[in-house]
């Protein structure tokens, strides 16, 4: 009986290793093997586009998938009234991912900025073909867009959740790209001290503003 248990354990271990993704190169010049697709929705999150998912634009490294899904579970316990939405990630085999300059080896994920409506309720930022799946949205100087306002508490909590879930898997976040002009608002939340101490944010404005979404690169060992 004990011999059978050992054999089964070995087989399960081999199967687990075989199902893990392998990333190569960098986020800007790499590829991915055995990429996995993020779930289209969960109890407190949704994908930015069903059609984009069908077209294969929501694949990531298996470790990144586990981190992202677990972060939403953590947030459900901490902020049950909040909802979240993820956006572009990459192709199953990585490689060039237009129009993005990165997202090439399964370690890059875009998340749509959490927002609240006029009543202060957490809602999803609208993403459809008429606003380029949300990427064409621009918040004004008051952090508002068509009656919606940026939910900095939810945004900060999500980044913290991603970081903590990454550490539990013995990996990390490499960087978070978010409009530098808006970052002070993140640091004013209750998670501000943690973010300053543990998360590396972009210092300069990127080629796109990154106000309607924040880009996260994960630090996972690659070949």
Task: Identify the function of each model-found stretch.
Residues 19-86, 151-167, 173:
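Active-site acidic/histidine clusters and adjacent loop/turn architecture
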Residues 13-15:
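N-terminal signal peptide c-region/cleavage motif recognized by signal peptidases
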Residues 80-82, 105-109, 210-214:
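Envelope-exposed proteins and targeting segments
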Residues 91-142:
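Acidic/His-rich structured neighborhood in mature extracellular/periplasmic domains
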């Amino acid at each position: 009986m004990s011999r059978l248990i050992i054999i089964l354990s070995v087989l399960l271990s081999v199967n687990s290793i075989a199902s893990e993704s392998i990333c190569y190169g960098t986020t800007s010049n790499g590829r991915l093997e055995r990429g996995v697709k993020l779930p289209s929705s969960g109890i407190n999150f949704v994908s930015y586009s069903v059609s984009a998912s069908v077209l294969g634009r929501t694949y990531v490294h298996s470790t990144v998938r586990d981190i992202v899904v677990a972060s939403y579970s953590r947030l459900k316990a901490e902020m049950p009234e909040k909802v979240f939405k993820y956006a572009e990630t990459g192709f199953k085999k990585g490689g060039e991912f237009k129009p993005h300059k990165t997202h090439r080896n399964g370690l890059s994920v875009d998340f749509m900025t959490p927002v609240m409506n006029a009543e202060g309720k957490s809602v999803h930022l609208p993403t459809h073909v008429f606003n380029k799946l949300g990427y064409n949205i621009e918040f004004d100087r008051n952090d508002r867009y068509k009656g919606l306002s940026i939910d900095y508490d939810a945004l900060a909590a999500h980044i913290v959740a991603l970081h903590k879930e990454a550490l539990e898997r013995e990996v990390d976040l490499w960087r978070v790209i978010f409009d530098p002009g808006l970052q002070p608002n993140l640091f004013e939340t209750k998670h501000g001290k943690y973010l300053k101490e543990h998360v590396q944010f972009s210092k300069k404005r990127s080629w796109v503003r990154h106000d309607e979404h924040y880009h996260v690169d994960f630090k996972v060992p690659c070949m």
